[in-house]
Amino acid sequence: MDFNLNDEQELFVAGIRELMASENWEAYFAECDRDSVYPERFVKALADMGIDSLLIPEEHGGLEAGFVTVAAVWMELGRLGAPTYVLYQLPGGFNTFLREGTQEQIDKIMAFRGTGKQMWNSAITEPGAGSDVGSLKTTYTRKNGKVYLNGSKCFITSSAYTPYIVVMARDGASPDKPVYTEWFVDMSKAGIKVNKLEKLGLRMDSCCEITFDDVELDEKDMFGREGNGFNRVKEEFDHERFLVALTNYGTAMCAFEDAARYANQRVQFGEAIGRFQLIQEKFAHMAIKLNSMKNMLLEAAWKADNGTITSGDAAMCKYFCANAAFEVVDTAMQVLGGVGIAGNHRITRFWRDLRVDRVSGGSDEMQILTLGRAVLKQYR
């Protein structure tokens, strides 16, 4: 088994290091986090490197580099302090439209390639339908040759500034036998109200409540096939959970290295605190968790590239990495002491971000349920 990166992957990682060393990005990230602003200038710099084309097929002008390459890039970005959670739509967002969208929809989304701007996101969660997706109440109703969308969504990522949202709704004409379909919605349409929510972490990406009051659509705005909404988003959930896990690992690695540098230079009782056995124990446990996360993620990326990744794999990565990474960051904060809880150290941002990730993108509890079912299914 060869864990070395290939030449193309090494070039991407080297490019990431060069970009992150080109200026004081941390000051920019801190400002964006404080003001809850999407770091568009940073994402544009990544797009200029071709990061938003990593998974796009070659026939569409992409690199088709694969998930192991995505993993290598995400891990390095995270290790160097970048908020990779704002990039979730970059690796697969274009491919989703190339696979499911009409030509008109594809053209609208592909126009954002290389810009660094937010382009679209899914709107599924509702006040009464979180993990219980089958309880969705938002409806679409056909009338006089048009389609009307009514209902409300909540905790919808990126929706304060994305020009398009793909909304999951149920057929209002079929109350007894629910039919779930997605619709491609231009956020400038009449009847849409957006309320931005404050969050503990992940502040560089918006989170909103959205209401739809007789929002008028056309049949051509259907996204994918009618009644195929759940099947389509299942794949998106797995993709998102893998990316969340990559983000968690990278962030934890950054916190670990910050704490290690501090432990080797912080002197108490006449010597660096890194020489104290209690501190060494903390680093041993952090290193075990980081190594376990990395190996799990690389295996999942390899499976994704070979078409064998399952929902159980994605759930395992999401659950383990969200929890292990938070534990690493929390321990690193303990090593930093007062420096980590007062002032402007970036570990406070990491701590807030990773606590949110145990809920965002699928709660811990739902990952356990998904994984448990997948494990037992193998032995039936």
UniProtKB/Swiss-Prot annotation:
User: What Enzyme Commission number(s) apply to this enzyme?
Assistant: 1.3.8.13
Can you tell which superkingdom this protein's organism belongs to? Answer: Bacteria
Reaction(s) this enzyme catalyzes, per UniProt: 4-(trimethylamino)butanoyl-CoA + oxidized [electron-transfer flavoprotein] + H(+) = crotonobetainyl-CoA + reduced [electron-transfer flavoprotein]
Q: In which pathway does it act?
A: Amine and polyamine metabolism; carnitine metabolism
Q: Where in the cell is it found?
A: Cytoplasm
Q: Which cofactor does it need?
A: FAD
Predominantly, its location class is cytoplasm
Quaternary arrangement and interactors, per the entry?
A: Homotetramer.
Described by its record, this protein's role is as follows: Catalyzes the reduction of crotonobetainyl-CoA to gamma-butyrobetainyl-CoA.
Q: What is this protein called?
A: Crotonobetainyl-CoA reductase
Which taxonomic lineage does the organism of this UniProt entry have? Bacteria, Pseudomonadati, Pseudomonadota, Gammaproteobacteria, Enterobacterales
Q: Which gene encodes it?
A: caiA
